[in-house]
Amino acid sequence: MFDINLIRKDIVVTKEKMLNKKVSSDLFDQIFGLDVLVRNLMQQEQNLNAKKNQLSKEIGILAKNKDPKLQQTLDLVNSIKSELQDISLTLSNKQDELNKLLLVIPNMPDDSVPIGNDENDNVEIKKVFEPRKFDFSPLAHWDLAAKNKLIDFDKSTKITGSRFIIYTNFGARLYRALQQFCLDMNVKAGFNEIWAPVIVNQESLIGSGNLPKFVDDLFKLENSNYYLSPTAEVQLTNLHRNEILKASDLPLYYTALTPCFRSEAGSAGRDVRGVIRQHQFHKVELVKLCKPEDSFKELESMTRQAESILEALELPYRRIALCTGDLGFSSAKTYDLEVWLPSYNAYKEISSCSNCTNFQARRAKIRYKETVDAPTELVHTLNGSSLAIDRLWAAVVENYQQEDGSITIPKALEKYIY
């Protein structure tokens, strides 16, 4: 949730920074006005309660002394109670209105994020490995899949519909091997493996920032409070929702492999062939919870962890720093890793590593204490793909294809495929 103290402290600077993230200035004026109203109502409520409590004490004395002012004082207390009821109702409604607005405002970009409008303004940080120069015309992964019977596209459509995949034969074994390889790499790097439900409740999606803004991107279970999770970021971030952690327990590192479900609203006509954009896909996720002063250092190490998998598989990739206009809703800073796909003759996103600062922690109420007597502070949360399995599968198949259409595998995967 957006930190309202930023608006209270300097609404002009806040507007300027958030304009870079495409948030209208009018929204902040609306929030500022509501916040002033809410705080005034709270002050009125506090003053009236103090007056009521004082009069209640006087009533006892007046009654004991049979003072003629007793009835007048009782009437005044009843009047205050009635006024308090009205103020309390108004305050509750206005507080709900304010919270709903705060829930749809994205996180503020960090000052280190390049300013820009869209993906064209993202900044390339580095490239690792040169794309392979084929001495033949390389096939796309969907053609290689058909040639080698790695995917049954027809049965996928028959059983479910478009944007779903059935991997078969060597294709299925490679898919499983990549999942295990990514998990093993993450666990060896110190991440605690979690096996989580793929159905999550509304509170979890609010905590991660997916709701209420991105409801159209989700699959909701009918007549329930449940949704199919769009990413294990939701489950892993919410492991400590409504908890106060010990500072000595931080940082916490988690990794999980889960199927992910997305409606892909608004993506009609994009990446219609192959496995790049599916309604259901698998992803190995990383999540970190840490102290605020450590979060940007943790972002660098998280990104390096995802990069280490691509390097172990010897896949050409590049790291991109997202500009303000391309940042995700919950993110203060994001690096994208893009792997080279010959079929596109371009780099395609395979990982997104983000520092969400205290944005998700405020929504999910994830706090920590330095000592028992110390005040609570919000943790910082980070998340990253390590990696998106279907896109990784496509990258391996395309980059390791041979002239006869066969596919070799990276040395790092040899012990995983049998």
Swiss-Prot record:
Keywords (alphabetical) are:
Aminoacyl-tRNA synthetase, ATP-binding, Cytoplasm, Ligase, Nucleotide-binding, Protein biosynthesis
Metabolic or biological pathway: Aminoacyl-tRNA biosynthesis; selenocysteinyl-tRNA(Sec) biosynthesis; L-seryl-tRNA(Sec) from L-serine and tRNA(Sec): step 1/1
Quick one: which residues bind L-serine? T231, A232, E233, E285, S385
Q: Name one GO cellular component term.
A: cytoplasm
Location within or outside the cell:
Cytoplasm
**Record PANTHER family:** SERINE--TRNA LIGASE, SERYL-TRNA SYNTHETASE
Its assembly, as annotated, is: Homodimer. The tRNA molecule binds across the dimer.
Role played:
Catalyzes the attachment of serine to tRNA(Ser). Is also able to aminoacylate tRNA(Sec) with serine, to form the misacylated tRNA L-seryl-tRNA(Sec), which will be further converted into selenocysteinyl-tRNA(Sec).
What does the entry's free-text domain comment contain? Consists of two distinct domains, a catalytic core and a N-terminal extension that is involved in tRNA binding.
**Per its record, how is this protein called by name?**
Serine--tRNA ligase
Q: Where does this protein come from, organism-wise?
A: Ureaplasma urealyticum serovar 10 (strain ATCC 33699 / Western)
Write the gene name: serS
